[in-house]
Amino acid sequence: MSAFTPASEVLLRHSDDFEQSRILFAGDLQDDLPARLDTAASRAHTQQFHHWQVLSRQMGDNARFSLVATANDVADCDTLIYYWPKNKPEAQFQLMNLLSLLPVGTDIFVVGENRSGVRSAEQMLADYAPLNKVDSARRCGLYFGRLEKQPVFDANKFWGEYSVDGLTVKTLPGVFSRDGLDVGSQLLLSTLTPHTKGKVLDVGCGAGVLSVAFARHSPKIRLTLCDVSAPAVEASRATLAANSVEGEVFASNVFSEVKGRFDMIISNPPFHDGMQTSLDAAQTLIRGAVRHLNSGGELRIVANAFLPYPDVLDETFGFHEVIAQTGRFKVYRAIMTRQAKKG
């Protein structure tokens, strides 16, 4: 994160207004403006582990990562700058959480790209902090209001649930495939062999559906799940518990917090980070897998057919197979052999 996003560039047009403010930055924090903007004091709260990694290097303990912000996270702040995400329920979860903690009279700024639906912030906050649009540039809108009433926030009311082939899947706003199993994951699941054994790592686990479905027909696997998203980590833990499946779940930026080697790594890797297209996570996954696979171990991922992963797989593993495909998706398989680069 070095170049500023369009949303941050709009905020910089008003930088003089923030010099005396004690600011809490939250939402879709795609760059390091929270660490660089000239303010009286700055804090940041994010649900994205990779964003926290960048900000904490510059802000220390003033950058926090968690599903739910606490009173300590917003202490002494008189201004909220909220970056609108692409997901409206995610925005509602985060804003209701933050506004329930901030004191009445807090200045509220909401900024985001028009295509993300930032306009709906006005309606969402109408009862708590009526907003007015104060700037429009770089295809973004900047809205300002003042907190008049704190909402009541109950994180439990945001949980969702659905069933897949008799399995219970727990979800939260911001979790991939929140409303049902996506087609890509269905295709990947169709390729998993029953009675598999060994250590399995699910990278970018989302709500945990891949892992619990795999464990149902391969009960002897030992599961580890990770994701950059705090909602995904909590949803996966809840999904495992709901299906009486054991596994370790933690936040990690691809392999950043992963220790040891595995017999199989499975993933439906993301190719968006917020509103931005990004292949970084998937390429990091493929290249880093060789440092976390046992000899003979396997990487199995599903991806949109148009994405350029075959070259990275061949470069890293020496070869790959396509073991299932539809018009839109392909499931790739690569084996850890002597040909594979050792990272």
Swiss-Prot record:
Keyword rRNA processing: yes
EC class: transferase
Keywords of this entry: Cytoplasm, Methyltransferase, rRNA processing, S-adenosyl-L-methionine, Transferase
Catalytic activity: guanosine(1207) in 16S rRNA + S-adenosyl-L-methionine = N(2)-methylguanosine(1207) in 16S rRNA + S-adenosyl-L-homocysteine + H(+)
Pfam families: MTS, MTS_N
Gene Ontology terms, MF aspect: 16S rRNA (guanine(1207)-N(2))-methyltransferase activity; nucleic acid binding
Subcellular location: Cytoplasm
Record has Methyltransferase as a keyword: yes
Enzyme nomenclature, EC number: 2.1.1.172
Cellular-component GO terms for this entry: cytoplasm
Family named by the database record: Belongs to the methyltransferase superfamily. RsmC family.
Stated role: Specifically methylates the guanine in position 1207 of 16S rRNA in the 30S particle.
Quaternary data: Monomer.
Protein name as catalogued: Ribosomal RNA small subunit methyltransferase C
Lineage: Bacteria, Pseudomonadati, Pseudomonadota, Gammaproteobacteria, Enterobacterales
